[in-house]
Amino acid sequence: HLTPVEIQLAIGLCEIFANQITLGEAEVQAQLVRDAKIKALQAQINPHFFFNAINTISAILRRDQEKARELLLQLSNYFRANLIGARETEITLGQERTQVDAYLELEQTRFPQKYNITFDQQVENDVYLPPFTIQVLVENALKHAFGARKDHNNVQITIKKLGARLVIQVADNGEGIALELLPKLGKEPLTSSKGSGNALYNLNQRLIGLYDERSALQITSSNKGTKIKISLPYHIKEGADNESLNR
């Protein structure tokens, strides 16, 4: 007989797969609307992350069923956020944080002690931004910044208001970006052995599509680390839902 935790795991997996089917349908519908290009760029799910997460949860399940259940809920949060992001061109910061926090918990469980992640959020959760904005920057840092280094890998995420602008910065203490690549990042598609070489380019294209010259992507790098900064118009919406996906 299945234990309650195993039943919950099966139910959660079914929900994830159902969400993926719904996401596919949402993408088809998105092609019929004016901003189809933007939504196509943002509705990207990394299959490697999904299978790595499932493997991590399966391994944890053998020794800590409650932790496995918590991770499964976070994986469900992650994919539910992808579903919302495929339908919307802007979401609240609270919704974005739910996905980022889910991603980070799964990655830090998979690689204990490898990453030190800190958030400095100086704005409320009801500010609006494009889906996956922070997620792309954080995932880019974890995948590309540190090479084979197994510890002392620091990532600082800063979110603040500067005048009428929302400024998001992700800084790491990694190996830095090759000088010949630095002018190209975010400006043109790049191939990558890790499968995410186009992430910054696609993000920048979405920002340009939404805000034109009112958005800015800035990248600075040295052998002591990299800083990627995004600047957007700061705005909230009247009566906006101030809660995350965990409500």
Predicted features by range, described:
Residues L2-I45, F49-I219, T226-K227:
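Two-component histidine phosphotransfer core
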Residues T226-H235:
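Short C-terminal beta-strand
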Residues I236-A240:
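Short, charged low-complexity linker/loop segments at the C-terminal edge of domains
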Residues D241-R247:
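Intrinsically disordered, low-complexity acidic/proline-/asparagine-rich linker or regulatory tail/stalk regions
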